[in-house]
Each structure stands twice: as structure tokens, then as C-alpha cells.
From Swiss-Prot:
This is Trigger factor. It comes from Bacillus anthracis. GO terms for molecular function: peptidyl-prolyl cis-trans isomerase activity; protein folding chaperone; ribosome binding. Its main location: cytoplasm. It is found in: Cytoplasm.
Length: 425
């Protein structure tokens, strides 16, 4: 087999591939063995029709497509290895010649991984993040704990305020007509949560138990129910009960209920401070890592093929679909609720997809430029770490991974980011 690579404009080129006649004939033979198993001919058992009779009745050309399906993937794979190129999309194949006892000649128009011209990636100036924890930070965290342990109690006197929960009946009307899904009874609405459409909750504020009111709102233009989107509506609302949060007292008893590992409020505050310090340090490290990677990516020159962005978009949509399934939802339901579709979703994700592809290409280029390698011991240590994290045997982790090659590549990327951080200004 012979292969010749000719670079065209941008990241596109043409592979001209020639395969020996012997391999062509072998592929035709293999195609016959496959096809003949499906043919019933009177006088012969299924799959036992002689080759000469087959060619006489159907013509040898009837085998060519199956033969091509056999020979093309192998020939194309060997050709890209020989040419030393890295395709990022399916090729456009053009068969110039295919027949028995003759060399196969075909071309493959290929989009390849782009060349990355690295810019500055050492000595990058990154902003130092403040990691000091103040007394105010601790008090705010304590207040959040207090809020989470608050109990809802009935407010006997007074009106609905922001932060209260109002138990209401409601029924919505558009153009004087009730609409599907617009009615509820004894619904607990947390005021200020933004659960209902904009403007609704604010108009419930100030009502007393037993009072009713017509709430005038407009559905958002992007509302998931197209027949309601952008339309004004009137909701008849009656407040049955008002509940307010009753905060527990901040004392040693509260501290023990919040965290059984502490005995006093002071111990709880000290633990909260330690947790906040660790959290801020972790957050600062992540921010620096993200920043150096983004700076290095921005400094590089790359002509990214659209095919790579499309592939990344498909991957992102699959990831999004998996997250939805964990919440008991699927893409079709999501499209209905949000009034969007597959094209709009991809358009929303496109900028992030471009960013991901650029960053991945730049990190790969840095790995190559700095000869970053990963040892077998480092891969083994990572597998053991994963086993401990998931509470699984090491062998089970290895079996789940199948191959550790992808893990080794991930570790190289991590090392590349470490390199950028260590060499930042």
C-alpha cells in the first residue's frame, strides 16, 4: 500500500491511497463468503452456491460494495498512520478505481488536528486570591446554619413578608379564560424564592390570612408553554395561612445539634473557620489553575476546525443529558419546559465548546513542548487513590477503566497545568 498526503487550505488535506491488487482480490473473496451465506439457490444448500455460478448470475460487481466496506477502513487506518496525520472528522472518500485484479485507488479528504503555535505560557501574571477568613465570614456561615435549622411556625398576626411561606389557593386566567396548570390549592409558596413567574410573589406581600387579591402579571417571552409566552394574566389568590421562620438560639445546645463532633458554640465557630479557610484555599488554587490555563490558551494561535467544535458540542450535549437523567428528566422534557430545541441548546453551548477545544489543544502542545511524561508508578498510585475514594478494589477500578491510557493522558494534562502554575509570575 502507498499513501501520499497533500495539505490543502486550512486544516484540510487529501490522502491519495493505492492498495495492491492482491488485497483487493482478498477483500472480494471475503465479501463473497459473507454474501453467499444469505442466498438461497435451488439445488444448493444455503451458503454453498459455487463462486462461478454466483458471478454468472449476479455479476462480480455485486460484491464490490461489501468488498469496499472490508478493505477501506483498514487501508485508511494504515494510510493515516503512514502519513502521520491526526484526523478530527470522518473523511470524504472518493473511489477512483476498484475492480478485480487491479490496484484500488481512492482519495480521502481529511480534516486534521490543527497546528498550535504557542504564545507566552511561562511567567504568566495571575491575580492572587485573598484567602483570609474574617469574623464576619464565620458569623455569616453560622447564620446560614441557623437558617437551615429554622422551623416554620404559623404567624398568628401580621401580613406576608419577604422570607415567609404563604399557604395559598390560586387560579390563573388569560383573556378571561382559565388555563391548564394554572390552578393550585393549599400551595406553600416561599416568598422571595422566585418559584412563580416574575412579579407574582411581590404582590402577595402585605396580605393577611384570609385575604384575597387579583395578582396581575405577564408570562415571560421565553416561557416554556408557547401558548402563554408573553401574555398578561390575572391570578385570583387567597391566603389561608402565613408561616415564618423561627430561628434556634445560638448556644452550646445549637452547636451540638449542628455538629455532633463539637461540644460548645466556640468549638463550632473554630471548626467553621477551619473549614472556611480550607475552602477558600481550595477555591483560590482552582482560580489560579483556571486563570493560567485560560491565559496560555488566549496567547496561542490556532485555527480550530469546525469539526472539532461539533464533536465537543456533541460530547457536551451527552454530558448534559446524563445530568438531566440523574434529575429524572430527559432532553425532550427539557426542551418543552424551556421552549428551546437541539439547535438552540448547541448555540448556547458553542462558546464553551470552542473554549474547551482551544484549552485542550494548547495543553497537548505544552505537554509535547515540555516533554511531560507520566510513569507507570504514578498511574498505579492514581488507580489506588480512585479505589480508596470509591471504596472499590483496585482490580475493579482497573476493569472499569478498561485501559489506563486515558487516565495517563489525564495525568499528563494535570501535570501540564501544574507546570503553568509553578512557572506563573
Amino acid at each position: 500500500m502507498a499513501a501520499k498526503w497533500e495539505k490543502l487550505e486550512g486544516n484540510v488535506g487529501v490522502l491519495t491511497i493505492e492498495v495492491d491488487a492482491k488485497e483487493v482480490n482478498n477483500s472480494i473473496d471475503a465479501a463473497f463468503k459473507k454474501v453467499v451465506k444469505t442466498i438461497n439457490v435451488p439445488g444448493f444448500r444455503k451458503g454453498k452456491m459455487p463462486r462461478p455460478l454466483f458471478e454468472q448470475r449476479f455479476g462480480i460487481e455485486s460484491l464490490y460494495q461489501d468488498a469496499l466496506d472490508i478493505i477501506l477502513p483498514k487501508a485508511y487506518g494504515e494510510a493515516i498512520d503512514e502519513a502521520g496525520i491526526f484526523p478530527v472528522a470522518h473523511p470524504e472518500i472518493d473511489i477512483e478505481k476498484f475492480e478485480k485484479n487491479a490496484n484500488l485507488i481512492f482519495t480521502a479528504k481529511v480534516t486534521v488536528k490543527p497546528e498550535v503555535k504557542l504564545g507566552e505560557y511561562k511567567g504568566l501574571a495571575v491575580e492572587k486570591v485573598e484567602t483570609t477568613v474574617t469574623d464576619e465570614d464565620v458569623e455569616n456561615e453560622l447564620k446560614s446554619l441557623q437558617e437551615r435549622q429554622a422551623e416554620l411556625v404559623v404567624k398568628e398576626e401580621g401580613t406576608v413578608e419577604n422570607g415567609d411561606t404563604a399557604v395559598i389557593d390560586f387560579e390563573g386566567f388569560v383573556d378571561g379564560e382559565a388555563f391548564e396548570g394554572g390552578k393550585g390549592e393549599n400551595y406553600s409558596l416561599a416568598i422571595g424564592s422566585g418559584t412563580f413567574i416574575p412579579g407574582f410573589e411581590e404582590q402577595v406581600i402585605g396580605l393577611k390570612s384570609g385575604e384575597s387579591k387579583d395578582v396581575e402579571v405577564s408570562f415571560p417571552e421565553e416561557y416554556h408553554a408557547a401558548e402563554l409566552a408573553g401574555k398578561p394574566a390575572t391570578f385570583k389568590v387567597t391566603v389561608h395561612e402565613i408561616k415564618t421562620k423561627e430561628l434556634p438560639e445560638l448556644n452550646d445546645e445549637f452547636a451540638k445539634e449542628a455538629d455532633e463532633a463539637v461540644a460548645t458554640l466556640d468549638e463550632l465557630k473554630a471548626k467553621l473557620r477551619t473549614n472556611l479557610e480550607e475552602g477558600k484555599k481550595h477555591e483560590a488554587e482552582h482560580k489560579v489553575r483556571d486563570e493560567v490555563v485560560e491565559l496560555a490558551a488566549a496567547n496561542a494561535e490556532i485555527d480550530i476546525p469546525e469539526a472539532m467544535i461539533d464533536t465537543e458540542l456533541d460530547r457536551m450535549v451527552r454530558e448534559f443529558e446524563q445530568r438531566l437523567s440523574q434529575q429524572g428528566m430527559n432532553l425532550e422534557l427539557y426542551y418543552q419546559f424551556t421552549g428551546t430545541d437541539a439547535d438552540k441548546l448547541k448555540e448556547q453551548m458553542k462558546e464553551d465548546a470552542q473554549k474547551r477545544v482551544r484549552i485542550n489543544l494548547v495543553l497537548e502542545a505544552i505537554i509535547e513542548a515540555e516533554n511531560i511524561e507520566v510513569t507507570e508508578e504514578e498511574v498505579t498510585a492514581e488507580v489506588e487513590k480512585m479505589a480508596e475514594m470509591y471504596g472499590m478494589p483496585v482490580d475493579a477500578i482497573k476493569q472499569a477503566l478498561g485501559s489506563v491510557d486515558a487516565l495517563a493522558e489525564d495525568l499528563k494534562v494535570r501535570k501540564a497545568v501544574d507546570f503553568l502554575v509553578e512557572n506563573a509570575a
